[in-house]
Each structure stands twice: as structure tokens, then as C-alpha cells.
């Protein structure tokens, strides 16, 4: 039996012993060394050859990733590691750190119970470190810390042992500050990264060594020895004495939870069903014999096998050939193949049980975030939808160069929409022009060049990038009448800004989009009141949609209940496009004050009620002082002090604001905020301004008001682009 075959046998046997499983991820800021770390862990566990690790980037198995040298999709792999005489199964996920691919990170977090947060010793805690940590803590994923590239502090920055420890303490303190701020209440203390107990490791993933306090005590290696090895260029000897995979995987096994421990507190966070029900108890116990419950965390498209769903099982078991039920798309599907991941390969296994991560083929209609259960015991409700902290802010129009490619292009676009829930796709079969909205320039580029061009073999024309704007209101409208086309139904309403605290709760995901059949359910009502909505209104919310809400303040109108669904539909259509530039509205509250309906139901059908409320909402919004909002990005620039002035000028020239500046040694760290509309071509410009000597990164930071002096111009440009008549 070869090494790989032995490994597969071990993996199969360990899959049934919960306390010996760890589902873990590796996440970090771009280029802080996640994939190099993952590869060396695989090499250490005997999955790829040691000589190739670090250069091989086994988890960057996509050609596009290898060419760019960054991880774009999250890759999965299973391996075995021995700790204190016992073997453990480790399911490892490597996630992208580039801000444009944050959606993949969000999805990976749902599958794992613990994460190794990688932080570069030279750059320290960066914006994306903060974002991935926030996502992890939101999904109740326990973190441990690996400070990477320590050799650079010694060889390039020539730090003394005291300075080294000072630098480490600063990074650990920053990470712990974030954990204290964002961790679930019950774990705020317990999850802090503590050096003494070994929840922090230091090392160099590229040179394949790492160290932690427990390992120092075990092996007798001191910080001084590390400095000597690095200075004398003997890091390969250090790698033999303190191998990276041993230190990191020991830390993971000792400090990260097994599925049985983790599911007790993770399930209530992601599933809002009855904890005392059979399936509720079974998920909390991670019971392989309970009802089936799992969640699809990622869709991978394979040229040969078609669509593969990566799935985390929380309860029950999936065997090859089982009939499954997809809760979101309300469809049945058959598990044609059940496999475990080994990097780019999949190895078939007869069945997979609760607590594991697997690869399923045959779920054609599944999307990322889909709930999987058995048709005989449908999981009600499904798992909470995966919320992602950024939003698509850039749109491009694409058309196929050859008309014969049109049907294939539409199929590929639908497939991309299923794979990646941070992409918004609008397909217009009449004009042949399709819109793709993504998180940033790179995200869009990968979709158009790689997924459509390279994988799909379709040549497309890509239009100029368009920024996604929003509209909101700053005042309260007078009472507005919305009339149906036949003039027999009248609805009276007022538009006013939603309370800031309520909108903030919506952005944080405490309140989400939903329609209420009769009245607000108790859970939503409590959350709305906590967020600051008046109790009287919280009881009467009809619908929350895209961060807008409609409240029924009428009394004793019988026909209103019959028309409820139509009113909600009309409200949604009304806020889809605001009055200024037909961009989506947000933060708008519509209060329904009164209504009169025709007594004959035939005269108050959809074709009458929907337009009445839709036009009413639009009129109310346009008379409530509407304004335009634009997407903003936080920007972090790390540059030598000599170029600080040029870097600041580059931000100021783009309508940006400097939020904070720090100096560390001869480097300056600049934090600012810049409108996305002004960020095109920034990469080249900042490289020129600092002669290529700066590190920079951006992160989406919400929508802000467009300055008054340019609002008219921007609105005119959008209306012109959309072919709306100029106001």
C-alpha cells in the first residue's frame, strides 16, 4: 500500500471517532502566508513531498491562483496527525485573504469549528485579519494565532530579543483586543490567545519551522537559539528540531474543539429551530445515527464530475445513492458520489457521518449555504443564511462576442451565481447584455477572464465598470395617497427614515429580510425592540426588505389582511429603485396609515393593489428629501516615511479622508477612507507615488452620503447611463 492509500484508510477509520476529529481553517490577510503554511502542514503529514512544499502551493490548485500567487477559492483537504500517542483526523480548509474573495471565507467558516489565524510578524494585524477574525467569531469558530515570517524580523529588520518579544506582544494584544470585542459573551475570556498555555505559535511557514512556549519547554529551544539559527542561515536545521507541522497541529489538537464540543454551542447560533426536538438534540450531540442535517459550504465545478458540493454534516450520515432534500431550493437530489477531499483530488468513501466535511456529487441545484436533509425528515427551518460583511459594489455589463455562445454564457452565469453568493447576476435574454456585480476589480476580473473565458471557453466583451449606489431619505413625507389604476382602492402612507440603531442592527445581521404573514413573530419583535424600534411599531411590521421596512399602522380594515401579500409585493417593487436615479433604497420606513378598498374582490386584485402601493411608496420617498449614497472603502497604506506625503496626497486627490496615522521605525501606517468611485487605477498610482515600496489594502466599509456639490452631477450621469429622462 502506498503512503496516500494508507492515509486514506486511516482517514476512513478516524471519521467515526468524534473526539479525534478537528475541523479547522487557516485564515489571514493576503500574502501573510496561509497557503505556504497549509502546504507545509500537508507535507509534514505525508500528503505531498517535502521538497516541493512552499513552492508547490498544493492548495492553490487552480491555474489562475498559481499565476497570481494568491488563493482565490477555499480549498479542502483531510489528513492524519499523531499527538500524545493518539492519531487525529484533521479536515483543513485554506481560505483566501484577498478582500475581493471574502465570500469564500464566510462560507468556509460555516464548515469549521476552529481556525488558525495567521499574522505576518512584519506587517502585524491588517484589515483583512480583522475581517476574517470577525467572521470566525460570528460563526462561533475558536481562534488560535500563528505569527509568521519571524525570520524576516531577525534577518531583515535585525531586531534584538527584547524588540522581538515587544513586537509579538503588540500583535497578540491587538488580536486579543479584537477577540474581546467580538467573541461570544461566554467565551470572551476563554478564547483569548495566551502565549503560556500555547495558543500562540511563532515561526516561518516558508522555512518550515515553528515554536510555541510548550514546545520550547519540551525541546529546550530558546528565543536566543532561534535568532542564532536565523542569523547563521541554518533555518533548515531549525526545521528539523522544531518542525512547523508538529507545532501547529499539536496546538490545533490541544486548543481547538472537536465537533462534539463545538456543535453544542455552534448549532443554536446557525439554526433557529427547536433545540429540544429530535434533530435539535441530535445536532447538539453530533449523532451519526440521528436525522440527517448538513450545510453546503461551497460549490466547486469540476470539468469531469460537474458540480461538487462541499458539505459539513452536523447530524446523521450520507451514503452513496441516498436520496437527499435541499431545503432552500425545495428539491430532492441523489448523492451520486460521497468522497473526502485531498487537495485537488477527491477520494470516494462508502459513507460520511456527522462531524465531518465531505464532497458530494449529484446536487445539481445546490447553492452555497444550502441546507441538506432527508426527504423523510425535512429540517424546518433550514440553517441561517450565510451573511457576509461586504456587499457587491462594482458592476460590469458583459456580452458574448459570438451570438452562438449566448445559451452557454447564460448557463455559466447561472452556475457562477450558485457557486458564489457574493456575486449578483442579472440576466437579460432579450438584449443579450448581462450584469455581474462583484466585490472589487479583481473579483470581477477573475469571473470574466477565468470562469467565463478560460473555464467556459467563451469570448466576452466587458463594459466599463459601474459603481453601485444606494438612495435613502433624510426627512419625513406628508401623507401620500396611492391610487389603483381603476381609482377604487386608495392607500395612505408616510415615508420616514428608519431609526439609525435599527438600520445598524440590520447591517450587523441581528435583523434580516423577512415577510410576516399575520403579524411580527415574537423573536423578530424582541430583536426590533432591542434595536430601538417603538414597541407599538415592532408588533406591526409587515416586511423587512433590503434594509427597508413597511409597518401597518391602520386599525380595523378587514380587506387589508387579504391584500397583505400584494401590499408587501408593491412595497418591494417601490423600494427597488429610488426617485433620484432608480438605485436601490435603504433605511426607508413606510408607515401605512389608512386604506379604502372596493368591496368586490375582483376589483382589488394584483393588477390594482400592487401599482397603487408601488406608486405611493415612490411618491412618499421622493417627497421625504431623498439623497444618494455611495460605497466607501477603508484603506490601509504601509509605506516608508519618505513617501508618506505622496501617499497622503494620493488619498486626498481621490476625495479621501485620512482617519489615522502611526509611525513605526522608518515606516508610516496611514488609515483612510475613500469612495469606491475614485479607486479605479489606484494600484498603479500608489505604486508610482511610492516607487513600489508600499503595502496597501482596502476593505468595504458601508455606504455614505454623496457630497452635495457633486450629487446633481452623479445623479445626471447615472440617469443618462440608464436611459432615464433627465430631471
Curated annotation (Swiss-Prot):
The keyword Cytoplasm applies. It comes from the Archaea. GTP binds at residues 28-35, 94-98, 148-151. Gene3D superfamilies: 3.30.230.10, 3.30.70.240, Elongation Factor G (Translational Gtpase), domain 3, P-loop containing nucleotide triphosphate hydrolases, Translation factors. InterPro entries: EF-G-like_DII, EFG_II, EFG_III/V, EFG_V-like, G_TR_CS, P-loop_NTPase, Ribosomal_Su5_D2-typ_SF, Ribsml_uS5_D2-typ_fold_subgr. Catalyzes the GTP-dependent ribosomal translocation step during translation elongation. During this step, the ribosome changes from the pre-translocational (PRE) to the post-translocational (POST) state as the newly formed A-site-bound peptidyl-tRNA and P-site-bound deacylated tRNA move to the P and E sites, respectively. Catalyzes the coordinated movement of the two tRNA molecules, the mRNA and conformational changes in the ribosome. Belongs to the TRAFAC class translation factor GTPase superfamily. Classic translation factor GTPase family. EF-G/EF-2 subfamily. This is Elongation factor 2.
Amino acid at each position: 500500500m502506498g503512503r496516500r492509500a494508507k492515509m486514506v484508510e486511516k482517514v476512513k477509520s478516524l471519521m467515526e471517532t468524534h473526539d479525534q476529529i478537528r475541523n479547522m481553517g487557516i485564515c489571514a490577510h493576503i500574502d501573510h502566508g496561509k497557503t505556504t503554511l497549509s502546504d507545509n502542514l500537508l507535507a509534514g503529514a505525508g500528503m505531498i513531498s517535502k521538497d516541493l512544499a512552499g513552492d508547490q502551493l498544493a492548495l492553490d490548485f487552480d491555474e489562475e491562483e498559481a499565476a497570481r500567487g494568491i488563493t482565490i477559492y477555499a480549498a479542502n483537504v483531510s489528513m492524519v496527525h499523531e499527538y500524545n500517542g493518539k492519531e487525529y483526523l484533521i479536515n483543513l480548509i485554506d481560505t483566501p485573504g484577498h478582500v475581493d474573495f471574502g465570500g469564500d471565507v464566510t462560507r468556509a467558516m460555516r464548515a469549521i469549528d476552529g481556525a488558525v489565524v495567521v499574522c505576518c510578524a512584519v506587517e502585524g494585524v491588517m484589515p483583512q485579519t480583522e475581517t476574517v477574525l470577525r467572521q470566525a467569531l460570528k460563526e462561533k469558530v475558536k481562534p488560535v494565532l500563528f505569527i509568521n515570517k519571524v525570520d524576516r524580523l531577525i534577518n531583515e529588520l535585525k531586531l534584538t530579543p527584547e524588540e522581538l518579544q515587544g513586537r509579538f506582544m503588540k500583535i497578540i494584544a491587538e488580536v486579543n483586543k479584537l477577540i474581546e470585542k467580538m467573541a461570544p459573551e461566554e467565551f470572551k475570556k476563554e478564547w483569548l490567545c495566551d502565549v503560556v498555555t500555547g495558543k500562540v505559535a511563532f515561526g516561518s511557514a516558508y522555512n518550515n519551522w515553528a515554536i510555541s512556549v510548550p514546545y520550547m519547554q519540551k525541546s529546550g529551544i530558546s528565543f536566543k537559539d532561534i535568532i542564532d539559527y536565523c542569523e547563521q542561515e541554518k533555518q533548515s536545521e531549525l526545521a528539523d528540531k522544531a518542525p512547523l507541522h508538529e507545532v501547529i497541529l499539536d496546538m490545533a489538537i490541544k486548543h481547538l474543539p472537536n465537533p462534539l464540543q463545538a456543535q453544542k454551542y455552534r448549532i443554536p447560533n446557525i439554526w433557529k429551530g427547536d433545540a429540544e426536538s429530535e434533530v435539535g438534540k441530535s445536532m447538539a450531540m453530533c449523532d451519526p445515527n440521528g436525522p440527517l442535517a448538513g450545510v453546503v459550504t461551497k460549490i466547486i465545478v469540476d470539468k469531469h464530475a460537474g458540480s461538487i458540493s462541499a458539505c459539513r454534516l452536523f447530524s446523521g450520515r450520507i451514503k452513496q445513492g441516498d436520496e437527499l432534500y435541499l431545503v432552500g431550493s425545495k428539491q430532492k437530489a441523489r448523492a451520486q458520489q460521497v468522497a473526502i477531499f485531498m487537495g485537488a483530488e477527491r477520494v470516494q468513501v462508502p459513507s460520511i457521518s456527522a462531524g465531518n466535511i465531505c464532497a458530494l456529487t449529484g446536487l445539481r441545484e445546490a447553492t452555497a449555504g444550502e441546507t441538506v436533509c432527508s426527504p423523510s425528515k425535512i429540517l424546518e427551518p433550514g440553517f441561517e443564511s450565510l451573511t457576509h460583511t461586504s456587499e457587491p459594489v462594482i458592476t460590469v455589463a458583459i456580452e458574448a462576442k459570438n451570438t452562438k455562445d449566448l445559451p452557454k454564457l447564460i448557463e455559466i452565469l447561472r452556475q457562477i451565481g450558485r457557486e458564489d453568493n457574493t456575486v449578483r447576476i442579472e440576466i437579460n435574454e432579450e438584449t443579450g447584455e448581462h450584469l455581474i456585480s462583484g466585490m472589487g476589480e479583481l473579483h470581477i476580473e477573475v469571473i470574466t477572464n477565468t470562469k467565463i473565458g478560460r473555464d467556459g471557453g467563451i469570448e466576452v466583451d466587458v463594459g466599463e465598470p459601474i459603481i453601485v449606489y444606494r438612495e435613502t431619505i433624510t426627512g419625513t413625507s406628508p401623507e401620500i395617497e396611492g391610487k389603483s389604476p381603476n381609482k377604487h382602492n386608495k392607500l395612505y402612507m408616510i415615508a420616514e427614515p428608519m431609526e439609525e440603531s435599527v438600520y445598524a442592527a440590520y447591517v450587523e445581521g441581528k435583523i434580516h429580510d423577512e415577510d410576516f404573514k399575520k403579524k411580527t413573530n415574537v423573536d423578530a419583535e424582541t430583536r426590533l425592540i432591542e434595536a430601538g424600534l417603538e414597541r407599538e411599531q415592532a408588533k406591526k411590521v409587515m416586511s423587512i426588505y433590503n434594509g427597508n421596512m413597511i409597518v401597518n399602522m391602520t386599525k380595523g380594515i378587514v380587506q387589508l389582511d387579504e391584500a397583505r401579500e400584494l401590499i408587501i409585493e408593491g412595497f418591494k417593487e417601490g423600494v427597488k429603485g429610488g426617485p433620484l436615479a432608480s438605485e436601490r433604497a435603504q433605511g426607508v420606513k413606510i408607515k401605512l396609515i389608512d386604506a379604502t378598498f372596493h368591496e368586490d374582490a375582483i376589483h382589488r386584485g394584483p393588477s390594482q393593489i400592487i401599482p397603487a402601493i408601488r406608486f405611493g411608496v415612490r411618491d412618499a420617498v421622493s417627497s421625504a428629501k431623498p439623497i444618494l449614497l455611495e460605497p466607501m472603502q477603508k484603506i490601509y497604506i504601509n509605506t516608508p516615511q519618505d513617501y508618506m506625503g505622496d501617499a497622503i496626497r494620493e488619498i486626498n486627490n481621490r476625495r479621501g479622508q485620512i482617519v489615522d496615522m502611526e509611525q513605526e521605525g522608518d515606516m508610516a501606517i496611514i488609515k483612510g477612507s475613500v469612495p469606491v468611485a475614485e479607486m479605479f487605477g489606484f494600484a498603479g498610482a500608489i505604486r508610482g507615488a511610492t516607487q513600489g515600496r508600499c503595502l496597501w489594502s482596502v476593505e468595504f466599509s458601508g455606504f455614505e452620503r454623496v457630497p452635495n456639490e457633486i450629487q446633481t452631477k452623479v445623479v445626471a450621469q447615472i440617469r443618462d447611463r440608464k436611459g432615464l429622462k433627465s430631471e
